[in-house]
């Protein structure tokens, strides 16, 4: 769970995709794509935050004296960890799909040259997937905060 997702802006195909869009005067697609990539970067930061919160929570739970409470909290924490891991996988899949689409379009443009009509990635289906992911992550954050508050109260 501590493996960080690679930054999507660092991918060479993303840079090349932006260059092609810029050369073709597709400013609106540049803005949409940047917005999408910024959103993904923000979600990565939230995943990293959640990962550290779960680790902190596990450490706090280990210090609890009451074995019944400790085991209950461990169980809840494991559920939260699974949710965070699932969110991380979902985000990774979305990034892979975006990068695959970008790579395909860059390669098509290279192959067909300037005569080719520049295709752009379809942003809308990625946005829908990210909204669902965001709702799931938000619920996970709330669960984690509630559990941390319970641990602090004990």
Set out the residue ranges of the language-model regions.
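Extended, low-complexity amphipathic alpha-helical repeat segments
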Residues: 95-154
């Amino acid at each position: 769970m501590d493996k960080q997702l690679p930054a999507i802006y660092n991918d060479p195909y993303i840079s090349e995709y932006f260059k092609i869009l810029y050369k073709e005067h597709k400013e609106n697609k540049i803005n949409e794509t940047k917005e999408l990539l910024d959103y993904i970067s923000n979600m990565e930061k939230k995943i990293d935050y959640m990962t550290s919160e779960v680790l902190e929570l596990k450490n706090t739970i280990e210090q609890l004296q009451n074995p019944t409470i400790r085991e209950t909290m461990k169980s809840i924490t494991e559920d939260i960890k699974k949710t965070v891991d699932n969110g991380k996988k979902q985000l990774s899949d979305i990034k892979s799909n975006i990068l695959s689409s970008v790579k395909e379009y860059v390669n098509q443009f290279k192959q067909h040259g300037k005569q080719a009509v520049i295709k752009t990635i379809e942003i809308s289906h990625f946005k829908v997937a990210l909204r669902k992911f965001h709702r799931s992550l938000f619920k996970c954050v709330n669960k984690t905060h509630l559990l941390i508050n319970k641990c602090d109260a004990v």
